[in-house]
Amino acid sequence: CSEKEQSNCFKRIRACWNGIMGKSLSKTFVRRTAAACRNCQSTCPKAGITPAPRADFSLRPGAYYGGDTGNIFAVLDGELEGDPVIFCAHMDVVEPWSGKKSVLEKDGTIHSAGDTVLGADDISGILEILYGVQLVLDSGKPHKKIEILFTIGEELYVKGSDVFDYSKVTAKQAYVLDLSEETTFNIGTIQGGTATNIVPDCCVLTAYETPLESKSVTDFQKACEILGFSGGLTGTFGGSDNNSFAKNGIEGLVLSNGMYNAHSTREYTTVDDLYKGAELIGQLILL
């Protein structure tokens, strides 16, 4: 179908979504962030999150390092040929998280009670992926195969995605929902010097950069244009699960998922950001 048909379809879906499913989305987020444990496998049923129809969500043997779950890899078969896209978000959250309680304000802002983190980093990414897939299924539009990876240990130097078996992945491009408004400097590898008793003449820091002409970038820009979003591109010095995709030959982008003041008790998100994130995921699937 044409871009105009896709755009009109999503406008109709959004109207239905806002009218019928809006409360479901915000309430799901509040329940999910208020759940007692930190992993998606045991928490999703408590939060009212169920796998999308026809989706094969199964727990893969992940990198166990003292937690109570592994990475979760999901595949949803599609009707169209072509390389699938993989969407990724991480399940772990930072301290303080125990006893967290989420508050939904009338203006659509969601925050914690003030004594814990909210967990929008990265629960908002998980929900946007799940609801984005649901938008596509509800639209009835044919789509390519969809792959999803929910990782463990991202906050502990991407431990989960670092040891994941990427032979399971057939996607050639990835979208990682884990970008906040600012981040800290992170170096992946450092090389320099020849001996411990000699001052090195130089130090080489290797960085990863997704080319502007790559398909992941152009598809993102196209999806934003169809939806009327003013999406922009920016560099980031932070580490994320996208680093692991890059090491395994999968190009990708880290997308904003509507989290603010991450890693603090002032963390918050908004219902509107969750909607837009889900719509963006859905549009990327249909490209």
State the predicted function of each range.
Residues 5, 10-45:
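N-terminal hydrophobic or amphipathic helices/low-complexity stretches enriched
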Residues 28, 180-287:
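Metal-dependent amide/peptide-bond hydrolase catalytic core
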Residues 43-81:
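A non-catalytic alpha/beta surface segment that caps or lines the substrate-entry region
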Residues 68-69, 80-85, 98-100, 106-107, ...:
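Short coil/turn connectors at secondary-structure junctions
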Residues 75-119:
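Catalytic-core environment of secreted peptidases
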Residues 98-100, 158-163, 200:
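Short acidic, glycine/serine/threonine-rich loops at helix termini
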Residues 111-120, 231-234, 265:
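Short pre-catalytic strand/loop immediately N-terminal to key active-site residues, enriched for Gly-Thr
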Residues 118-189, 208:
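Acidic/histidine-rich catalytic neighborhood of metal-dependent amide-processing enzymes
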